[in-house]
Structures are given as C-alpha cells and as structure tokens.
C-alpha cells in the first residue's frame, strides 16, 4: 500500500472473506497501488488521481452538488473498486443532507473485497468511508445490498446486457463507466 498514506488500513483475509464462484477480473497492480484489469488492459481509475477524475466526470459532470436530494437514485455500469459510490456518498455527506440516496451498480467482474480495499488506499479523501465500509464489502458481494442511515447500495452481479433487463427503476442519474473503449 501507499507508504505515505498513514490512514491506510491493513487489509487481511480474515476481515475480508473471499468470494467464490464469480468471474475473477485477474488484476495486475501498477506500482502496487493501481489495479489494472488484464482482460481489458485498462486501469480501474486514473493513474494521476482517481478521486479527482470521479469528481470531474461524474459528480461535477452531472451537477450533483446541486441535484442530490433525499431519494435521489443513481445507477452505474461497472462497480469496480467502489470509487464512484464512495465519492458520491462523500459528496452527500459533505452537503449534510437529510435523508437517503439510492445507488444501484451492475458489475460483471467483481473484485475480491481485499482487492477493493487495497485500491481504496489510494484515496486519503475517502479514508473515513473506506474505514466504515471495510467489513461490509464481503456482505455486499454476498447479499447484493447494503443499507445505512443515508444510503442504500445495491449491487447486481452479471453481464449488464442480461441483468439490466430486470431493472425497472427510474433513476435520476446514470454513471456510464467502463474499460476502454468505453
């Protein structure tokens, strides 16, 4: 993990139960910090600053600082490391809004929880959220849903070309993310 990130948590297999029977994305790690999906030869987030990339493309690009409100629904193609979700929840909490946001993500190649946590060590801005979700990623991947006081997160595993057909919820915003060519 990043040696200069003093808030980095130790990721252990005891805390993050591995998933079985799923499509492993087979990762390479650039500088032991940035996950790259071998199948697509593409990093999961910007090599320069993934958090700033998410803020620019998704949060600011969708004007979410003005649009997020109680009951706001976001859907996403590609959960990846959870960076888009954590960044959205970060913005929601920065706004000190009352109520709840609803976030649904479709993922064909889910990362192991231990891989998600390793990748999240790159983002000191999200360290409190990373710590909060540390023990919950395994539960999300097993159950498909997490719910807290200010969010509901739903993860739908499988190829979105098939799984999205059962998704009949209207949303306020889509995050269309993916590997090159996206």
Q: What function would you assign to each model-found segment?
A:
Residues 172-182:
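A short SAM/SAH-binding and catalytic strip from SAM-dependent methyltransferases
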Residues 165-173:
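A short acidic, Gly/Pro-enriched loop at the edge of an enzyme's catalytic core
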Residues 12-75, 87-125:
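Rossmann-like AdoMet
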Residues 78:
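Conserved glycine-centered beta->alpha loop in an early N-terminal alpha/beta scaffold
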Residues 118-166:
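S-adenosyl-L-methionine
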Residues 82-86:
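Glycine-rich SAM-binding Motif I of class I
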């Amino acid at each position: 993990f990043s040696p200069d990130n003093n808030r980095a948590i130790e990721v252990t297999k005891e805390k993050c139960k591995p998933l079985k029977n799923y499509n492993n994305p087979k990762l390479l790690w650039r500088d032991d910090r940035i996950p790259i999906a071998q199948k697509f030869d593409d990093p999961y987030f910007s090599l320069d600053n993934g958090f700033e990339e998410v803020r620019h493309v998704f949060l600011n690009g969708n004007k979410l600082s003005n649009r997020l409100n109680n009951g706001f629904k976001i859907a996403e193609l590609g959960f990846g490391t959870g960076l888009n979700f954590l960044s959205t929840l970060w913005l929601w909490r920065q706004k000190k809004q009352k109520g709840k946001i609803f976030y649904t993500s479709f993922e064909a190649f889910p990362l192991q929880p231990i891989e998600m946590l390793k990748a999240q060590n790159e983002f000191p801005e999200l360290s409190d959220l990373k710590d909060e979700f540390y023990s919950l990623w395994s539960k999300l991947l097993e159950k498909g849903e997490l719910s807290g006081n200010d969010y509901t997160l739903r993860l739908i595993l499988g190829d979105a070309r098939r799984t999205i057909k059962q998704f009949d919820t209207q949303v306020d915003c889509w995050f269309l993310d993916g590997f090159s060519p996206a």
